[in-house]
From Swiss-Prot:
The keyword Ion transport applies. Residues 1-273, 322-327 are cytoplasmic. This is Zinc transport protein ZntB. The chain crosses the membrane at residues 274-294, 301-321. The gene is zntB.
């Protein structure tokens, strides 16, 4: 493949444009640099910036359909061979489990053995690990190594997110054993996060597996082996997600049962109170509506005797409920 001039790739408002030095480090791309397989270029763009958008729309280095894909709407993870290059769409986790579950950041990239063009709208936090290694001189030395390191960082962030969700589920299960109900909507949000993760990480695992099996010229056997390890690791994370989704379903049933039992206990308590006070209410009502006058109304001990009668009646009903094992 022909070498590329640095001036053809330099974009003024690029997030960064670096030339890999072949020893694990990078240097800023300059116009007089020569880009080839020994010194590939990594161009990282925010496709909403005007200069980046114009470069994507006009550069002859990219096929026409690749230009649209790099600046298009978010899509599910996929990999496509485009002539001498490969178009890859990946998803990564940004932030914590308290954020919206569907806020997965899309990163699109087109690469061959000479240069890498990656685009995003929001910052991809997982790239910070790769950038840090390159700046310290311990990063990838070629395009294949770069892709493996990026996929490894994305999988690390996904695994950490899955582990956080798993810890939350364990805490919920422990609280349910103590009859503690989570706040309204908490379990639904947790379940949605798991489902969204499952939706995007399953095709991403397939992307990794395909990259491990494809005979791409810029990937060595060691790169393919590492990529297969990453696919297997993400596959284990998907198994954990499936288990967590099943556990949230069980917890939802358990929460419904706990709430139903709590309501039943309250209803039972109110029914017992009604049974205890129903006879006394009947007597007070009967005496109160007596049109011929209240019996014992002219006797000074009448009210006291009536109160004693009510206490004895309530005590008798309570004793009967206790012996009947209703209390």
């Amino acid at each position: 493949m022909e070498a590329i001039k640095g001036s053809d790739v330099n974009v003024p408002d690029a997030v960064f444009a670096w030339l890999l030095d072949g020893h694990g480090g990078v240097k800023p791309l300059e116009d007089n640099d020569v880009i080839d397989s020994q010194h590939p270029c990594w161009l990282h763009l925010n496709y909403t910036h005007p200069d980046s958008a114009r470069w994507l729309a006009s550069t002859p280095l990219l096929p026409n359909n690749v230009r649209d894909a790099l600046a298009g709407e978010s899509s599910r993870p996929r990999v496509s061979r485009m002539g001498e290059g490969t178009l890859i769409t990946l998803r990564c986790i940004n932030g914590s489990t308290d954020e919206r579950p569907d806020q997965l950041v899309a990163m699109r990239l087109y690469m061959d053995e000479r240069f890498i063009v990656s685009t995003r709208q929001r910052k991809v936090l997982a790239l910070d690990d790769v950038v840090s290694d390159l700046q310290e001189g311990t990063g990838p030395v070629d395009c294949g190594g770069w892709l493996v390191d990026v996929c490894d960082a994305l999988t690390d962030h996904a695994s950490e997110f899955i582990e956080e969700l798993h810890d939350k589920i364990i805490d919920l299960e422990d609280n349910l054993l103590d009859q503690q109900i989570p706040p309204r909507g908490f379990l639904a949000l947790l379940r949605k996060q798991l489902i969204v993760m499952r939706r995007y990480m399953a095709p991403q695992r397939d992307v990794y597996a395909r990259l491990a099996s494809e005979r791409l010229p810029w990937m060595s056997d060691d790169h393919r082996r590492r990529m297969q390890d990453i696919a297997d690791r993400l596959g284990r994370g998907l198994d954990e997600i499936d288990a967590c989704i099943a556990r949230t379903g069980i917890m939802a049933d358990e929460i419904a049962q706990v709430m139903q039992e709590s309501l039943a206990r309250r209803t039972y308590t109110m029914s017992l109170m009604a049974m205890v006070f129903l006879p006394s209410t009947f007597l007070t009502g009967l005496f109160g509506v007596n049109l011929g006058g209240i019996p014992g109304g002219g006797w000074r001990f009448g009210f006291s005797l009536f109160c004693i009668l009510l206490v004895v009646l309530i005590g008798g009903v309570t004793l009967w409920l206790h012996r009947s094992k209703w209390l």
